[in-house]
A protein has these predicted regions:
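P-loop NTP-binding/switch modules centered on Walker-like glycine-rich loops
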Residues: 50, 188, 192, 196-274
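Charged, flexible cofactor/metal-binding loops and thiol motifs
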Residues: 4, 18, 22, 245-331
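Conserved ABC ATPase signature
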Residues: 158-162, 166
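Helix-to-loop junction immediately C-terminal to a conserved catalytic motif
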Residues: 63
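A short, proline-enriched helix->beta-strand linker immediately N-terminal to the Walker B motif
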Residues: 177-181
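Conserved ABC transporter NBD signature motif
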Residues: 71-84
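Conserved ABC ATPase "signature" region
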Residues: 79-82, 136-153
Length: 331
């Protein structure tokens, strides 16, 4: 039986914002709203959706970089936090756990401190976790920079001396030196040129196989997710609306929103382009979402129940989940 390394249950992150400059009224922004999924050890899990749907907030809340409003996260059979039961790892316990749970950030320009040389950037985690210092730490940094396709003498250079693709490789090396079990990639290739994206993707695949890693990848690029991920969850306005094995989800695409996303993947086939699904209307504000199904304002299959009841994420086949009242009629 495949073992789950990460369990996310009913995760919530809400923000309270003032309605206006001089108004005492406030609104609750449900950035992450009752999100649940599990990730199998050694697999790659993709979380996809339009910009602003809550993907990155979900990733940071899982790592406890952002304080959760509700729900629980369990990593490697240990509870990271359970808000309802008031269970949290201490700061020191969380610091140790982060050695096993790393993140690769989206922007390779903003994620590296321009005042630090590459040696200091890559060895910072080694020193903080008291794994290695001095020349020992530098040698480890050189080893992982080499695995990521960079020269060992890169340790003496500064971020401005590298291209975007090289900087992202440095960010990957920084995550890898701590020998993590689990890595979150927050849009790790979206800021790179197309030619470099393929190289970095192949590097991530090689590292996964070599070090038996588990990945959670955040992306709005479905062609990348289809190629790279074993399972995929589709997110809309803070909630997950469909989850399944990658190949099955791209073939079945039961939810109307998933259908629209997949139809928007660029293709040279004119027949596919002619059948592209164009969604009407704008994404509602997360501070004022519609009643019932959050997608009903843009869905051509909307019925009365969609405007009144929030659809539950239900398992409709083994390992396949969907949150839609009318999925069986649509398909």
């Amino acid at each position: 039986m495949e073992q789950e390394i990460l369990r996310v249950k009913n995760l919530k992150k809400y923000y309270t914002t003032n309605k206006g400059l001089f108004s005492g009224n406030s609104r609750v922004v449900r950035a992450v709203d009752d999100v649940s999924f599990n990730i199998t050890r050694g697999s790659t899990f993709g979380l996809v959706g339009e910009s602003g749907c809550g993907k990155s907030t979900t990733a940071r809340t899982i790592l406890n970089l952002i304080e959760p409003s509700g729900g629980s996260v369990e990593f490697d059979n240990e509870i990271i936090y359970n808000v309802e039961d008031n269970i949290y790892l201490s700061k020191e316990e969380m610091r140790k756990k982060r050695k096993e749970m790393q993140i690769i950030f989206q922007d390779p320009y903003a994620s590296l401190d321009p005042r630090m040389n590459i040696g200091d950037i890559v060895t910072e985690g080694l020193k903080k976790h008291n794994i290695a210092h001095g020349n020992d730490a530098i040698n480890i940094a050189k080893e992982f920079l080499g695995l990521c396709g960079l020269r060992g003498d890169s340790v003496n250079k500064f971020p401005h001396e590298f291209s975007g693709g090289q900087r992202q490789r440095i960010g990957i090396a920084r995550a890898m030196v701590l020998n993590p079990k689990f890595i979150i990639g927050d849009e790790p290739i979206s800021a790179l040129d197309v030619s470099i994206q393929a190289q970095v993707t192949n590097l991530l695949i090689d590292l996964k196989e070599r070090f038996k890693l588990t990945y959670l990848f955040i992306s709005h690029d479905l062609s990348f997710v289809k190629y790279f991920c074993d399972r995929v969850a589709v997110m809309y306005l803070g909630s997950i609306i469909e989850v399944g094995d990658s190949k099955e989800l791209f073939n079945r695409r039961l939810h109307p929103y998933t259908q629209a996303l997949i139809s928007a993947i660029p293709t040279s086939n004119p027949l596919i382009r002619a059948n592209r699904i164009i969604l009407e209307g704008d994404v509602p504000s997360p501070s004022n979402p519609p009643n019932g199904c959050k997608f009903h304002t843009r869905c051509k299959y909307c019925t009365n129940i969609c405007t009144e009841q929030v659809p539950e994420l239900k398992e409709v086949d083994k390992g396949y989940f969907i949150a839609c009242h009318n999925w069986h009629k649509i398909n």
